[in-house]
Regions:
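Non-heme Fe(II)/2-oxoglutarate
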Residues: 15-89, 96
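Residues that cap or initiate secondary-structure elements
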Residues: 75, 102, 125, 162, ...
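Short, charged, solvent-exposed linker or helix-capping segments at domain edges/interfaces
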Residues: 76-78, 88, 129-132, 185-189
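Catalytic core of Fe(II)/2-oxoglutarate
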Residues: 133-205
Length: 205
């Protein structure tokens, strides 16, 4: 009886605090359509994944909370996918960005960039998360994770809220910025173009 009495009081408190709805929603485990947030490319890296350490001795500059250094066209231009994307949409910046150990790059949407092409270069422990649902404003969120595969490019939706948690080693990521801002080049446009490009190339093989 005492246990039942305790749980009744506890449940009433949850109702009073408005947590009952939150708890029920958090118990659900809905399937998320991750292609709203990111899309894995079929084309694998042939050059950047092996040559990126060459640029780590360059000067690093602060860039939106990251440390960044450029990747020269002599390297990224050997990637057929990136060369084709650049011909269609034109890159403004192509480079490697670095996060320090034990660093949380908090929830945000990119200021100007609508989308990018990313590839994780170092595969120590880090997590890239996208918010899929706000359960309690500024407090509780559902999320999905982009689990980067080695040597793999991803179309990345910079206008969906995302964050990065990095642990004990520096984290290196290939990324790019386009000449077009978020109002001129959307994630959906880039994703669809890359999908068509890869389908055409696959049919030629």
């Amino acid at each position: 009886m005492r246990k039942m009495h305790f749980f009744c009081i506890f449940y009433l408190l949850l109702i009073k605090l408005g947590y009952n709805t939150i708890m029920l929603r958090m118990l659900k485990n809905p399937k998320t359509d991750n292609t709203k947030y990111f899309k894995e490319c079929n084309t694998r890296s042939s050059t950047i994944s092996s040559r990126w350490p060459e640029v780590t001795t360059q000067r690093w500059v602060s860039h939106y909370g990251f440390q960044a250094t450029p990747l020269p066209p002599e390297i990224w231009g050997q990637e057929e996918l990136l060369k084709a994307v650049n011909e269609e949409f034109k890159f403004d910046n192509v480079g490697v960005v670095k996060l320090p150990p034990y660093f949380n790059y908090g929830w945000h949407r990119d200021t100007d960039r609508g989308c990018s092409i990313n590839m994780l270069l170092s595969h120590d422990e880090s997590h890239t998360l996208f918010q899929t649902e706000v359960v309690r404003e500024n407090m509780d969120f559902r999320f999905t994770e982009l689990k980067y595969k080695p040597d793999t490019f991803y179309i990345f939706n910079s206008q969906e809220s995302h964050c990065v948690l990095n642990f004990k080693e520096p984290r290196f990521l290939f990324t790019c910025e386009f000449g077009q801002d978020k109002n001129e080049l959307s994630y959906e446009t880039l994703k669809n173009w890359v999908s068509k490009y890869e389908t055409r190339n696959q049919s030629k093989d």
